[in-house]
Structures are given as structure tokens and as C-alpha cells.
Amino acid sequence: MAAANAPFALVSRLSPAARLPIRAWRAARPAPLSTGGRTRPLSVASAAQENRDNSVDVQVSQAQNAGNQQGNAVQRRPRRAGFDISPFGLVDPMSPMRTMRQMLDTMDRLFDDAVGFPTRRSPAARARRRMPWDIMEDEKEVKMRFDMPGLSREEVRVMVEDDALVIRGEHKKEAGEGQGEGGDGWWKERSVSSYDMRLALPDECDKSQVRAELKNGVLLVSVPKRETERKVIDVQVQ
């Protein structure tokens, strides 16, 4: 094959004395893929942020058993969303109690990560993603919200033990009793939703005036603060 007709040109920068006699060169190019004249960009997935344990000690467990028929049981794992925030274990996952200050700090971090820049939890930031719990604090009271879908007022219990706010709830449901596929058995679906949380209240909160209200599966808790008088003592300088 002549050098002028070769699909690729070969350039040698060696001296004439060091060149080896080359009789013929052949260049093989791969066959083009049938992409229809379009090029597909290469998408590179960047590493996600560290899996921070930014959540409250609200233990929610749901178990569903559908079918007691013979055969192998397959357990499906729940899908993880792109912005997966679990409401369990805020700082130390082994600690059974969380403080209200930790919850406030966690809410600030969660909303800062969601919008990408520091914020004070504006209404626009809240509209982007609804968290399963929320807490707000002002000079008069502390307001908390916990999502408890499917639970009635009789199934939720709120109490104050010493300096801790305890929230517990459990809902059991049985449905779908009937004949299974092929008529070889009966099946029944059971679901259980359970909530158990202990939250340490600060000293300035009035534990005897805690109010709780459940509306449409949302628990609203209000903890008023005591009015503290500042005492000023003049210290004589000698």
C-alpha cells in the first residue's frame, strides 16, 4: 500500500542512520458504531456526601407479611431516595435520648444541605422537601411536629417523665383475607406501625403545660417556656 493512500500518516523523528527499513504499513481503524450520527456524552457520577447521621431518635418500624403460602419467601428492600434522610438517631445512634438543641442544629444542617447555602429555614426552603418531623423555637414556646400517618388519637400517647418528653404510638392493621392464587390456601396481610421517642427538654421549659394535638396523622406538640427574671448584682471594684 502506498504511503499517499494510507489512511494514517506515519512521521519518524529518528535520524536517517537510525531508521529501519520499512516496506509496508497497514493501519486498521475500528468500524464505526451505528449511532445515527449522534454522539452520546459520557456521564460521570460524582461521589455523594458522607452518610451523616443527622436525625432524631424516632423509631418507626413497619412490617408487612403478605401470604403464608408454601414456597420461598423473598424479602424486598426499600428503595433509597436520592435525598435519603432517616429520622433515627441524631448524633449518637446508641443513645436513647436526644436534646432539643440537637434537633434544632440538625434541622439547620438539613435545610442548609438541601438548598446549598446557609439559610434560616425560610418558607421557600421548607416547600422543597417536607421532613417527617420539624421543630421551631421562639422566646415564648417550642413547637414540634411529627408525622404519624394512619394513627388515631387513641393510639398515640404523649407524656413527660422527669425532664424528658416521651411520644409513643402503635397501629396494627389486618386486611385482605381471602383465597390465595390457585385456590390452595388463604392469605392475610398484616401491617404494624410503631413510634417511640424520648426527647430531653431544656430547663426553661414548663413541663406541666405541655400541649399535644393530633390532626390528620400529624402530631403537634407545644411546650411553653417560663418567664425568667434576670437578676443583676453589682460587684464592687476595689
From Swiss-Prot:
One of its GO terms (biological process) is response to heat. CDD domains: ACD_sHsps-like (cd06464). This is Small heat shock protein, chloroplastic. Keywords: Chloroplast, Plastid, Stress response, Transit peptide. Gene3D superfamilies: 2.60.40.790. InterPro entries: A-crystallin/Hsp20_dom, HSP20-like_chaperone, HSP21-like. It is found in: Plastid, Chloroplast. PANTHER family: 26.5 KDA HEAT SHOCK PROTEIN, MITOCHONDRIAL (PTHR46733), HEAT SHOCK PROTEIN 21, CHLOROPLASTIC (PTHR46733:SF4). It comes from Triticum aestivum. It comes from the Eukaryota. Its main location: plastid. It holds the Pfam family HSP20. Residues 124-238 form the sHSP domain. Residues 31-87 are annotated as: Disordered. GO terms for cellular component: chloroplast. Belongs to the small heat shock protein (HSP20) family. Residues 58-75 have a biased composition (Low complexity).
